[in-house]
Every structure is written in structure tokens, then in C-alpha cells.
Amino acid sequence: MALVDGFLELERSSGKLEWSAILQKMASDLGFSKILFGLLPKDSQDYENAFIVGNYPAAWREHYDRAGYARVDPTVSHCTQSVLPIFWEPSIYQTRKQHEFFEEASAAGLVYGLTMPLHGARGELGALSLSVEAENRAEANRFMESVLPTLWMLKDYALQSGAGLAFEHPVSKPVVLTSREKEVLQWCAIGKTSWEISVICNCSEANVNFHMGNIRRKFGVTSRRVAAIMAVNLGLITL
């Protein structure tokens, strides 16, 4: 599955099952064997009732919930206070309970991987965890570092589209873009940088960034890439 096609399919999916399957397929195409996407609405700490999809082993998921591991798992606490990914290095498991958690997760086949924090535009909080199979930790880390830029994009699209499926939000007024905003976003959608767009549109890079800021505000998102996909889905621009 081509990356852009996958992003579009996430946005256009008709339900949670289809959306989850698309996300798993994209992660698999990148080289990850297991994923878990979890999201909470604003101001909620009810981890056991979070919106969760993925292909983690069912027995492990049940044990995780039964043992209350959301309050032990160091990746969970990390995601509440950071936007940076956290790799499943042995050093992050510091307490006795965390060491037990690590041993049990490893026994379930979740040895090497990373977790990407999710912070939504409407206050949603969550994580995208991805596990990779490898001969050793060094091999796993080399692989994850090589695909990290793509994972940043994937988690943005997954967050934006997943939040729309997981939680009901009031319908907002239609997004209206100026002709210049459409032009700027059109070039952004095919991967052009602000500098490249400024050359194409014969304006300053600061002017491009100004329009990008207005576009993100109108869509209520923090990522220009997500705004571009939303604009495509609304028929405001085309790829």
C-alpha cells in the first residue's frame, strides 16, 4: 500500500474495523508485526475504557487490563508528559513492578518496539505502540530509526482520523479556504516544503507559513499534512 494512499484510506474508512485494518496494514508494510492504538477523550484517565484497536495478542491484552498495567507501563506515563517517541529499552523499566511487566510483555512476544505519544487538537491523549521482530536489540533499533520519519507522519494521520471515529464531536461550520490557501495547500499535499512553495507561488517563505497557520487553524489541527488530507477529502483540493 502506497503511503499517501494509506493516509487517504484512513480518512475515508467507514468504521472502526476498517480503519483498524488499514492502520495495521500500513504498519505491517513498514515492517512492524504488532501495533496498538489507544486514545482517551479530553480530561479522562479511565485507561481501561479507552478506545483501543490493534493486533496485540488477546491473552496479553486481557492480562494487561486485569493487572492494571496501564498504571505500571512506563510508556503510558511518558505519553502524558511528552510528544517524543519512547523506545522499549530495558532502562525505562525501573521499579520491581515494571521489571515484572517487561518480562511478561517479552514472554508475550512484545520485546522490541517503540511508543508514539498522541496529543489531539481537542485534548485527546493516547499512544501508538508498534512492535518489531528482530534477532537482537541493535538490529531492531537500526530498523526503527530508519522508519522514524515515516512513523511521525503515520501517527499524525492515525490520531486525526482515529479521534473522529472514537469520539463524537459537535459538527463544525464548513471550512472555507481562500484561493491562495488552496494553492499553498495543494503544493503541500504533494510534499513541497514551505521554501519550495514560496518559489512556485512567487512569494516569501514567511507568507507561505502565514497561510499554513491559517489553514491549520481553520481545520482545527496542528499538522499541515493532516490539513492537506482533510482538504482532499472535502474536495477543496485534489492530488
From Swiss-Prot:
<dbReference type="GO" id="GO:0009372">
    <property type="term" value="P:quorum sensing"/>
</dbReference>
<dbReference type="InterPro" id="IPR036693">
    <property type="entry name" value="TF_LuxR_autoind-bd_dom_sf"/>
</dbReference>
<protein>
    <recommendedName>
        <fullName>Transcriptional activator protein LasR</fullName>
    </recommendedName>
</protein>
<dbReference type="InterPro" id="IPR000792">
    <property type="entry name" value="Tscrpt_reg_LuxR_C"/>
</dbReference>
<keyword id="KW-0805">Transcription regulation</keyword>
<keyword id="KW-0238">DNA-binding</keyword>
<keyword id="KW-0673">Quorum sensing</keyword>
<comment type="function">
    <text>Transcriptional activator of elastase structural gene (LasB). Binds to the PAI autoinducer.</text>
</comment>
<dbReference type="InterPro" id="IPR036388">
    <property type="entry name" value="WH-like_DNA-bd_sf"/>
</dbReference>
<dbReference type="GO" id="GO:0032993">
    <property type="term" value="C:protein-DNA complex"/>
</dbReference>
<dbReference type="Pfam" id="PF00196">
    <property type="entry name" value="GerE"/>
</dbReference>
<keyword id="KW-0010">Activator</keyword>
<dbReference type="InterPro" id="IPR016032">
    <property type="entry name" value="Sig_transdc_resp-reg_C-effctor"/>
</dbReference>
<dbReference type="Pfam" id="PF03472">
    <property type="entry name" value="Autoind_bind"/>
</dbReference>
<dbReference type="InterPro" id="IPR005143">
    <property type="entry name" value="TF_LuxR_autoind-bd_dom"/>
</dbReference>
<dbReference type="GO" id="GO:0045893">
    <property type="term" value="P:positive regulation of DNA-templated transcription"/>
</dbReference>
<dbReference type="GO" id="GO:0010468">
    <property type="term" value="P:regulation of gene expression"/>
</dbReference>
<dbReference type="GO" id="GO:0001216">
    <property type="term" value="F:DNA-binding transcription activator activity"/>
</dbReference>
<feature type="domain" description="HTH luxR-type">
    <location>
        <begin position="170"/>
        <end position="235"/>
    </location>
</feature>
<feature type="DNA-binding region" description="H-T-H motif">
    <location>
        <begin position="194"/>
        <end position="213"/>
    </location>
</feature>
<comment type="similarity">
    <text>Belongs to the autoinducer-regulated transcriptional regulatory protein family.</text>
</comment>
<keyword id="KW-0804">Transcription</keyword>
<dbReference type="GO" id="GO:0043565">
    <property type="term" value="F:sequence-specific DNA binding"/>
</dbReference>
<dbReference type="GO" id="GO:0060310">
    <property type="term" value="P:regulation of elastin catabolic process"/>
</dbReference>
<dbReference type="GO" id="GO:0006355">
    <property type="term" value="P:regulation of DNA-templated transcription"/>
</dbReference>
<dbReference type="GO" id="GO:0000976">
    <property type="term" value="F:transcription cis-regulatory region binding"/>
</dbReference>
<dbReference type="GO" id="GO:0003700">
    <property type="term" value="F:DNA-binding transcription factor activity"/>
</dbReference>
